[in-house]
UniProtKB/Swiss-Prot annotation:
Gene designation: gpsA
Keyword Amino-acid biosynthesis found: no
Protein name, as recorded: Glycerol-3-phosphate dehydrogenase [NAD(P)+]
Entries under Pfam families matching the protein: NAD_Gly3P_dh_C, NAD_Gly3P_dh_N
Function (record text): Catalyzes the reduction of the glycolytic intermediate dihydroxyacetone phosphate (DHAP) to sn-glycerol 3-phosphate (G3P), the key precursor for phospholipid synthesis.
GO biological process assignments: carbohydrate metabolic process; glycerol-3-phosphate biosynthetic process; glycerol-3-phosphate catabolic process; glycerophospholipid biosynthetic process
Main location: cytoplasm
Cell compartments where the protein resides: Cytoplasm
Protein species of origin: Vibrio parahaemolyticus serotype O3:K6 (strain RIMD 2210633)
Alphabetic keyword roster: Cytoplasm, Lipid biosynthesis, Lipid metabolism, NAD, NADP, Nucleotide-binding, Oxidoreductase, Phospholipid biosynthesis, Phospholipid metabolism
Length: 345
């Protein structure tokens, strides 16, 4: 268990620093602080952070949810990183490496880093653990937090379950202790560091496909088939990377996949809906008004599947729609026209 440490800019023990003050980072910080812990929330825009401090709420993304008193708002990265041994990075995947590199000069000798970012490295499709090891070396403990969570429901204190994985069992136990709240927020331990990272990236892509299917008007049968076959693609890619099959039947796999594919709180699903209804990619993204992780994730997962030689027909068709201008309805027709095959393949 982490020892109390008040030797920081705040003069109090800080259980965790959350790096990233978007809707999800803010909701995780709120949830942690509700457990009675002192939590620092850092964001890169001083004006945004000043507004959060003045309002003691994030009215833009989490209306009606007030900040606990123990939540500290910070725009100074050095103070934030130095404040706690444990960092929780919650930023879009395409800036994960940039943000981690910015944190690097301020890391403590005992720093441990967990992330709730879902995605892969842009342009390479590498797992985020490999990005982290390249940037900060292998002397720091790393962990990943993943599962079916919508930011607003988490911030409101509605029941939620999630999983955490790390090669460091002590870090997992400490994260469970800090994050788990038996009344509303359940945290499961998982020992599959690879599979936990992969599930969050692939499900974003499949959610776009589910939205496209519904936008075209294909109905519940088609959506369910797409989710099921999407899970098969996720599992095949995971097997090629050495992940454990059971991970994809858990929170970071099936759980997150079903949530993101079936509820319109999901930006990825709403993005797909717009595409299925005939909007172009740029217009659909603009209407969402926030980062659509699945857009970049599609290219990342497609690149990884090509490199690993794993057949992922749903991912391939969505990639063609997003990056090659293919019509969404034609992509759906091409999926339906594929040759007969056994379900397990």
């Amino acid at each position: 268990m982490t020892q109390a440490n008040t030797n920081n800019a705040y003069g109090k023990d800080i259980a965790m620093t959350v790096i990233g003050a978007g809707s999800y980072g803010t909701s995780l910080a709120i949830s942690l602080a509700r457990n009675g812990a002192n939590v620092v929330l850092w964001g890169h825009e001083p004006e945004h952070m000043a507004r959060l401090e003045a309002d003691r709420a994030n009215h833009a993304f989490l209306p009606g949810v007030d900040f606990p008193e123990s939540l500290i708002i910070e725009s100074d990265l050095e103070k934030a990183v130095q404040a706690s041994r444990d960092l929780l990075v919650v930023v879009p995947s395409h800036v994960f490496g940039i943000v981690l590199n910015s944190c690097k000069p301020f890391l403590r000798e005992d720093s441990r880093i967990c992330w709730a970012t879902k995605g892969l490295e842009p342009e390479t499709g590498r797992l985020l653990k490999d990005v982290a090891y390249d940037i900060i070396g292998e002397n720091y403990s790393l962990a990943v937090l993943s599962g079916p969570t919508f930011a607003k429901e988490l911030a409101m204190g509605l029941p939620t379950a999630i999983s955490v994985a790390s090669p460091d069992a002590e870090f997992v136990a400490d994260l469970q202790e800090k994050i788990h709240c038996s009344k509303t927020f359940r945290v499961y331990a998982n020992n599959d560091f690879i599979g936990m990272q992969l599930g969050g990236a692939v499900k974003n892509v499949i959610a776009i496909g589910a939205g496209m299917s519904d936008g075209i008007g294909f109905g519940a049968n088609a959506r369910t088939a797409l989710i099921t076959r999407g899970l098969a693609e996720m599992s095949r890619l995971g097997a090629a990377l050495g992940a454990k099959p059971e991970t994809f039947m858990g929170m970071a796999g099936l759980g997150d996949l079903v949530l993101t594919c079936t509820d319109n709180q999901s930006r990825n699903r709403r993005f797909g809906l717009a595409l299925g209804q005939g909007q172009d990619v740029d217009t659909a993204q603009e209407e969402i008004g926030q980062v659509v992780e699945g857009y970049r994730n599609t290219k990342e997962v497609w690149m990884l599947s090509q490199r690993m030689g794993v057949e992922m027909p749903i991912v391939d068709q969505i990639y063609q729609v997003l990056y090659q201008g293919k019509d969404a309805r034609l992509a759906a027709q091409d999926l339906l026209a594929r040759d007969k095959k056994a379900e397990g393949k």
